[in-house]
C-alpha cells in the first residue's frame, strides 16, 4: 500500500530501449505490450504516455490495434520530463489485490501489517513456508518451460531448488509437489498458451492497483491470470480469494487493454483447479472495498476487527499480528474501567 506515484526512470529507460529496438517496424499493440511485460515494464500506462508524446511529434503511427514506429529522434529527454510531470500529479492510494482481500477479512489486520507495520510473528516451520516453496517451484518451472522440452527434468529441477532454499522450514513431501507441478504443466498445455509468465509485477496508474500475479497465460486474443493458493478447496471459493482473483483480472486487463473473461484459482492441498468468470458485481465490490480502505486509513483511527462469521477461527487463528491486536483490545478494556 502506498500513496501517489514516484516517476521511475528505470522503467522509462526500458521503454526507450524497447522502442529503439522496434524502429521502422509495424507491430500489433498486443505484441508490443507483451514485449513490454517481458522487458520488466511494470505499467503499460508509462508506455502509452510515451507513445502519446511520440505520436504528437509524428514519430509513430497507430491504427486498428497496430503501431508503426518510425526513426526515433534524440528527443527522449524532453519526453521524459513531460511524462514525469504527468505522473507526479497522480494522487491515488495504490493497493494490491491481496490487500483488498485482507481488508475484506479484517480491516485491523491490514492496518497493523501495512500502516503501523507491527512485528509479524511467523512460524519457523510449516504452512507459510510450504506456500513459499510451492510458489517458488512454479516460478522456476515457468521461467524455463519455453526453453526446456524435457518436462520431467523441469519438474524435478524446480522441485529440488525449492526444497534446497527452504530446507528445514517446510513439511510438504517432495513427491506431492512434483505431482502438483506436473498437473500445472497439463493446465498450460490444455489451455494452449502461446506465452506464460510468472510473478510479474504489474501496476495500473489509472486504477491505483499494483500487484504480482502468480502466472499470466497469453493465447490468441485472451489473457488469463492464474492465482495459486496453498490452501485446500472445500467445495466453495472463499470471498477473499474471489476478490483477489478479480483484482488480478483488473490489473492484467488494464495492462493489455483487454477485457479479461476469466481467471484460474489453483489449490495446492487438494490439487483443485477452479475457473473464475469475471463478475461485474464482484468488480464493483472490489472498488467499493478499495474506497472503504482509503477512507478508513485516512481517518487516523484504529480500524475495527473482522466482522466475518466465525472470524476468530477463520481470520485470527493464523494471523501474524494477533499479539498486537490483542494488546489493543486489552488497552481498550483498561481505559473503559478508568
How would you name each of these model-derived features?
Residues 2-7, 43-46, 69-77, 205-208, ...:
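Metal-dependent nuclease catalytic regions and adjoining charged, substrate-binding loops involved
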Residues 2-52, 59-218, 338:
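Metal-dependent nuclease catalytic cores that hydrolyze phosphodiester bonds in DNA/RNA
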Residues 18-19, 121, 125, 202, ...:
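A general structural-boundary detector
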Residues 34-38, 185-295:
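Mg2+/Mn2+-dependent nuclease catalytic core
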Residues 40, 124, 128, 234-239, ...:
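Short, charged/polar micro-motifs that form catalytic or ligand-binding hotspots
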Residues 52, 246, 317:
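Short alpha-helical basic/polar micro-motif
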